[in-house]
Amino acid sequence: ATDACGNSSTCAQTIVVDDNAAPSIVCPANVTIQCTASTLPANTGTATATDNCDGAPLVTFTDATVAGGCPQERTITRTWRATDACGNSSTCAQTIVVDDSVAPVLTCPANITLECTVSTLPVVTGSATATDNCDGSPTVTFTDSNAGGACPQSGTITRTWLATDDCGNTSTCAQIIVVSDNTPPTIACPANVTIQCTASTAPANTGTATATDCDPAPVVTFTDATVGGACPQERTITRTWIATDACGNSSTCNQTIVVDDSVAPAIVCPANITILCTASTL
């Protein structure tokens, strides 16, 4: 201060400019994303901050993760922090839920028609394949539903394939397997045989044909065709064996039975006798 005569005096004032105010921070909204999506802020959002003095406060974040109900699910608590040039900071929290609600993609093998002699296991009829957005190895199983066909050995199998990922999401597809029986039984005839005319020509004596088939018990029958021999007691029988399964398929084979008469008659002479010359010798 200076008066009119030029006298002056001074005093000093100290002005301290301080920054004790933390930035104002605004978190991005909580979000639920699929397990295939990125959890980076570019996808889930970034916090914004303003400060009374610092025009560009530093914004950072840290994550704390809690596992979910299955390997592909989790909850991330993302803590955002805004710090100004004077070290003042403020925080806010964002919740990011990582979900797996997408079912696997399942591809069924082609429908197929096969004979009853062929296995219906997947190694023959084909297996379904599955891929998943998060689980690298979804579980693939199947169940069969059988509908009878026109005969016991034929029918239609509806094979329902099921793919399940680690989070329990499932998808299904159906494969149709038609089982046909167009194959006749395999029949084996008994050996050809020659018997004496005194022997029985019934199968219990001459042998019986055997048969195998999809049908566990094909019916085996026979018919005979007889040709006379050189004498009344001799003949040749052609026995045609027929095996028929439950689906009506049949096969045949022939057995030859020769009926022979090669045994001489058994003769019994009367006792020796002495008679008078006047007696008859008849």
Question: Can you describe what each PLM-predicted range is?
Answer:
Residues 1-282:
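Proline-threonine-serine-rich low-complexity tracts
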